[in-house]
């Protein structure tokens, strides 16, 4: 750390019963009261360098003729130590200045008026010497600039008026972003800050700190985390806006350190915690992956609990949505603080999914709008070519991008967790499930498990809601194990069970005879399936239009029941499907 020594005389100040005096052959003719300390001094050395004291003494001489004049400095900035250093400078006593006390002495010298206007002779007054020390020593050192900035919080208004705060922030920002080989050598990628500056010793004595010696082995992000919110925010803004670009990842790491230090420790005051959180969010870099998705989701959880502004929440959701493929299910369980009764914020997760889809490929969107009516996905897409494909393949010609498949699996796992919420509505569940495009789900096993969990927790939902919930399930994309479980699930609508059994039986039948099926025969079967689907769909829509409103709905036969006249009992249902299988084999 750099320091400056002024003066050459030994220290002759002493204390007698809380009164500070100077050892001298001359009688004391000036009494100065600073805070609770009284100083017995002499007019000549003090008035020759302090314009304020000179004016105060001059105004009192016209009113009183006492030999000892008493001056009370009631609004003196800082503590008595700063005043005493200024007084010793007036007497020529050696004083040592460094980053720890230069701000207090600079403010005291400004208050006392120790400028060139009152200085007698050719030597500079204290204000000029302090400014020279700040410019040539303190602001050339990252560590000294940081320590000096820390001390400005004791005298914030004076430091602002004198420009010390802004100059410290500017010096710190330059020290962080400067390139190697100049006054600072900042090893940014390893997180170490080393100072190799060599300061010229001009008219004042600057000592301390070797040129090649490492000034600090601590990362600058850890040091800045010790600052108060206002100084930290201003410093980070200066670093981000510097003409020398710094890695966004380092900015993000610094913000993570600051958030981990301050957010958990200010639970007493929600206003303070909100202010810290809002500031951290506003300082987040725009670049993707500059901060981990886990950190963004952690901030989003805090934002929901602390009720920060809606714009801040949306900013976090957008940033997290851009890298949703790196999230985990537990990180997506964002608590909901409103009075809806739901445990988790499903809407913000839905927004993140949509943001991810638009970010990774703007052309990708859910295949169905909210107001669009449709039957289940299995009913919409049944055709023989797809049934003949091996299990696990997609219904499209090409597999979806790996990131889309990963997010689809993440959403399905998330649905399994939130399905346990007794207050979760079917609409919320379905809307989130439908944000994933149909082609992005390679397998519907996880989606079925989520539906099963929801039905087990919400056994009293109406039949129309149960039917709506199961429409998002594509039976063709269920594995053998999932199909077996679903066929025996009494909570599923009977129509869904019929679809599952039909698809399984059709797949098994076609698997044994696919080598013998001609193109014409396949076309005939395909037209047969299409005709039956249209007839069953028309009959189902007519029944939906005549269904009673309110209470539990009467059971409506599914289109497959209408097609095949399948009884409601599972055993008879299975027998009927077996007969369908035999008839198909005979036709083939």
UniProtKB/Swiss-Prot annotation:
Keywords: Phosphoprotein, Ubl conjugation pathway
One GO CC term, this protein: plasma membrane
Domain BTB: residue ranges: 28-99
Gene3D superfamilies named among the record's database cross-references: Potassium Channel Kv1.1, Chain A
Region (Disordered): 529-554
Domain NPH3 per the UniProt entry, residue ranges: 218-507
One record GO biological process: protein ubiquitination
Modified positions (Phosphoserine) in chain numbering: 376, 378
Signal peptide: none
Functional pathway: Protein modification; protein ubiquitination
Modification sites for Phosphotyrosine: 448
Family in the record: Belongs to the NPH3 family.
Domain comment (free text): The BTB/POZ domain mediates the interaction with some component of ubiquitin ligase complexes.
Functional summary from the UniProt entry: May act as a substrate-specific adapter of an E3 ubiquitin-protein ligase complex (CUL3-RBX1-BTB) which mediates the ubiquitination and subsequent proteasomal degradation of target proteins.
Protein name: BTB/POZ domain-containing protein At3g26490
UniProt organism field: Arabidopsis thaliana (Mouse-ear cress)
